[in-house]
Amino acid sequence: MGVPSEGAVGNVNGNEVGTTASFAGYMETRGVREARVLASELCRHMYTLGWFSGTGGSITIKVHDDSIPKPRQLVVISPSGVQKERMVPEDMYVLSSDGFILSTPPLKPYPHKPPKCTDCTPLFMKVYEMRDAGAVIHSHGMESCIVTMILPFSKEFRITHMEMIKGIKGHGYHDELVVPIIENTAHEAELVESLTEAITAYPKTTAVLVRNHGVYVWGDSWISAKTQAECYHYLFDAAIKLHQLGLDWSTPTHGPIRSINGIWGCNGTMSRGLKVGGLSLDDMIEPSQRCILLDIEGTTTPISFVTDVLFPYAHANVGKHLAATFDSEETQDDINLLRSQIQHDLEHGVVGAVPIPPDYVGKELVIASFVANVEAMIRADRNITALKQLQGHIWKTGFQSNELVGVVFDDVPEALERWHASGIKVYIYSSGSREAQQLIFSNSNYGDLRKYFCGFFDTTMGNKKETHSYFEILRTVGIDRPSDMLFVTDVFQEAVAARAAGLEVVISIRPGNGPLPENHGFRTIETFLEI
């Protein structure tokens, strides 16, 4: 960042203005004045909330102008190292959309220090670039620090079944809110790379926590950013209070945090002779784990439901879905992911990949090329995020219209209820997107089963056949001993990868599942009631 040289003519959001009188006039427009006033008011307000104490924290707002596209609008940013409760409009910096400082605050007499633009500036500009935001807030609120300390090795904050989740864009009461956590650094500007990675890995998030530091929150406008920041801080505070009470904020019931020993699903109180579902407890698996990680296809759900129902539905409706929702933010996110994947496929000679024509040829031809690529991906049964995310959104339409109903094996609800009653945490890890996973269990043939799950993982954690993916899940859940988690899958290669990470593993034998290698060395089950 820098200041244009004296006497030069600069291009500010598409308008050629000089750096002297023209710049001065431009800085005095109504939009810039209002944005400066608003930013100073919000600084004073957020100081009272404890977000901007000790000169910490910062805010930035785009200068709204209907005649200028948001990516090219001017940016107002609060300064660094000043008393936020005493902020006035003249204290604000004004930057161009590409980060050049156009206006600096005036010098103030002792004991004030010379003005300095906040160290958050490169992070703010990165959020503007990646999320087309209208405002970004960086809070040092105490709750945003402490919540990252509760699970010191976790890379995510998760919470569900709280009313204030509805205040976060794209989330409802039953949804699981996931906020990525990045590690703090000595200098704020050094966070840009990890912030970029977090925003890329979590396309739905509107916040990123910085461990032992604070949180960045953004929205389409200053109102959206402020409202969501208030909701995030409420949820962080709720998690801390629940933790103090020994209650689990990450589960639907927010029940006691338990350490389970002995037989799963019976609190260790059942006698050895008791029969369960026709199985003797002598035949049941008795691990000491406190978490279960479940696959879906071939484990909780028949393979035929996926291959004969879900995949054909997505295949038959991809063109219709893209045409009907093409301009929506959700579908544009899907299309951007597909573009990246298709470009990668073309560069690597993947069969079925075809180039996407430029937008000016018309929407119909562009959609047709996407359909051709997606159909090729479906035929090849590729487990890639771009495809899984789009399929999930197509299936959402099917579930909402009651054209689709999720299917689980008959033993699944009973087992989930038993584990839940015993305080055992259950998670899902599937190649399908998190959203698709929740659709299956919220619209199942046994009703809404989501209350039994503590979280959902997809391939954003990594490939299911790679060991590092399971290490990531362990770190996210906050489990110190890998053997405290039991993984249930029908895929031998996944079982091998999970075992290499230290998890206990059993293989699910269900109708329609593929054969296993001879002498595979894993315990097998035919029903969850064996666990």
UniProtKB/Swiss-Prot annotation:
It catalyses: 5-(methylsulfanyl)-D-ribulose 1-phosphate = 5-methylsulfanyl-2,3-dioxopentyl phosphate + H2O; 5-methylsulfanyl-2,3-dioxopentyl phosphate + H2O = 1,2-dihydroxy-5-(methylsulfanyl)pent-1-en-3-one + phosphate. SUPFAM superfamilies: AraD/HMP-PK domain-like, HAD-like. Binds 1 zinc ion per subunit. Binds 1 Mg(2+) ion per subunit. The active site is at E163. Keywords: Amino-acid biosynthesis, Hydrolase, Lyase, Magnesium, Metal-binding, Methionine biosynthesis, Multifunctional enzyme, Zinc. One of its GO terms (biological process) is L-methionine salvage from methylthioadenosine. Residues 1-248 are annotated as: Methylthioribulose-1-phosphate dehydratase. GO terms for cellular component: cytoplasm. Zn(2+) binds at H138, H140, H213. Substrate 1 binds at C120. Mg(2+) binds at D295, E297, D490. One of its GO terms (molecular function) is acireductone synthase activity. NCBIfam families: enolase-ppase, HAD-SF-IA-v1, salvage_mtnB. In the N-terminal section; belongs to the aldolase class II family. MtnB subfamily. In the C-terminal section; belongs to the HAD-like hydrolase superfamily. MasA/MtnC family. This is Probable bifunctional methylthioribulose-1-phosphate dehydratase/enolase-phosphatase E1 2. It comes from Vitis vinifera (Grape).
